[in-house]
Amino acid sequence: ILKGVKLCKGMLSLWNNRKIEEMHPLELFKYCPKCGSPRFVENNEKSKRCEDCDFVYYFNASSATVAFILNERGELLVCRRAKDPAKGTLDLSGGFADCGETGEEGVAREVMEETGLEVVETQYQFSLPNTYLYSGFLVHTLDLFFLCKVKDDSQLKAMDDVADSFWMPLSEINPDEFGLDSVREGVKRFLKKHN
């Protein structure tokens, strides 16, 4: 199934003996999530259909958030990743949006979980697509970038999946040190606008 077909903009073509990063996520879905039937087949390049119950499953990008937080000195809050993917590289605070959450609520929750800082204001900046290898599964994301203001930046502490968090002058930031593709590109855009 789905062999040699190029799926979803920007994805690699599919061939036998591929790495997980090269597989379309729908290839990993073998059973209908509604009735459990193994007759869960390709419907088109974006979906699978159950031949028993007619359920159609469309694979869509997961929503994720990223925070640009500046302190009073104009320094950017930067984190160091504690876990893979890209463990040890620089990152910005953020993460997956929960069901029922707005992007603004999601970025505020993630900032609190990762840094202990309370977001009091958010302003949407832009979005970028990304892929994120998690537990052997390639997750396609749509990352929503926000400029955030926090209540008290003196309460900063690294928590959750952040090994370290610190303030960096914009002039010292090297986008190539950021491990995730979308965050690297987002930092480049942010620096171009704010330098």
Residue ranges of model-derived segments:
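Short cysteine-rich clusters marking metal-coordination/redox-active sites
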Residues: 32-35, 50-53
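Short Cys/His-rich "knuckle" micro-motifs
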Residues: 41-46, 60-63
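A short coil-to-beta-strand element that immediately follows conserved catalytic motifs
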Residues: 42, 118-127
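Conserved N-terminal beta-strand and adjoining loop/helix that marks the start
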Residues: 52-76, 96
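Conserved Nudix-box catalytic region and its N-terminal flanking loop in Nudix hydrolases
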Residues: 71-113
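NUDIX/MutT-family hydrolases
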Residues: 157-187
